[in-house]
């Protein structure tokens, strides 16, 4: 069985998508599902529109500290696939998949060699 936390393993709403929640999840051996958006040219972890205090996708990979735990990445904006793939390769993270409900967006992600899942 594979267990994924949702926005990290948070104990209060304020911890969602925050470092403490990701540390807790990864330290227990759980992967996570989270959302990636962009703000001012940076990839950030945020379910809603970024406010400026989000951790970056690169910081999330640093928190993983080389643990190749499963990541389910919901890409929330266009044009991020190449940078996401670059960072995954930089951190040698292979245990991931991206997903999106938009078929055209998934086609773009597939062209970049990202692993993509969908629901029909």
Question: Which stretches of residues belong to each language-model region?
Answer:
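Phosphate-group recognition and catalysis centered on beta-loop-alpha active-site segments
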Residues: 1-120
């Amino acid at each position: 069985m594979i267990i994924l936390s949702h926005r990290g393993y948070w104990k209060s709403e304020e911890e969602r998508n925050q470092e403490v929640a990701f540390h807790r999840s990864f330290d227990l051996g759980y992967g996570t599902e989270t959302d990636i958006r962009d703000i001012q040219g940076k990839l950030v972890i945020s379910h809603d529109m970024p406010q400026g205090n989000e951790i970056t996708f690169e910081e999330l990979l640093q928190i993983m500290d080389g643990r190749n735990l499963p990541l389910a990445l919901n890409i929330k904006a266009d044009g991020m696939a190449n940078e996401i793939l670059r960072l995954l390769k930089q951190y040698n993270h292979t245990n991931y998949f991206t997903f999106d409900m938009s078929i055209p967006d998934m086609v773009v992600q597939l062209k970049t060699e990202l692993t993509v899942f969908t629901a029909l």
